[in-house]
Amino acid sequence: MRDMMGMMKQAKELQAKMKAMQDEIATMEASASSGGGLVTITLSGKGTLSALKIDPSLMKEEEVEILEDLIIAAHNDAKAKLEAAMAEKTQSLTAGLPIPPGFKLPF
């Protein structure tokens, strides 16, 4: 019975820590550039695009395809940075817990 109470307490503590971590992640931002800084993108912790800066030199009709590629590259880089930061925070929170390898938490 004591073990069950202890597990319930641990689960409640973990839930509170996860909520705090989710709140912290929501306030994070990740920025990335492509094309040597010609395009810069910033994503919020929730993954929404919060800023996009484009160098005026790319605002030419013949540069549209290059601009599209640079936006995609910057977005993908910013997303990867955000996911890495989230994984790092999640790992520190779940250290020592018996979670199977490859198990993805729902946030």
From Swiss-Prot:
The keyword DNA-binding applies. Belongs to the YbaB/EbfC family. HAMAP family: DNA_YbaB_EbfC (MF_00274). GO terms for molecular function: DNA binding. Transmembrane segments: none annotated. Binds to DNA and alters its conformation. May be involved in regulation of gene expression, nucleoid organization and DNA protection. This is Nucleoid-associated protein Oant_0022. Its main location: cytoplasm. It comes from Brucella anthropi (strain ATCC 49188 / DSM 6882 / CCUG 24695 / JCM 21032 / LMG 3331 / NBRC 15819 / NCTC 12168 / Alc 37). It is found in: Cytoplasm, Nucleoid. Keywords: Cytoplasm, DNA-binding.
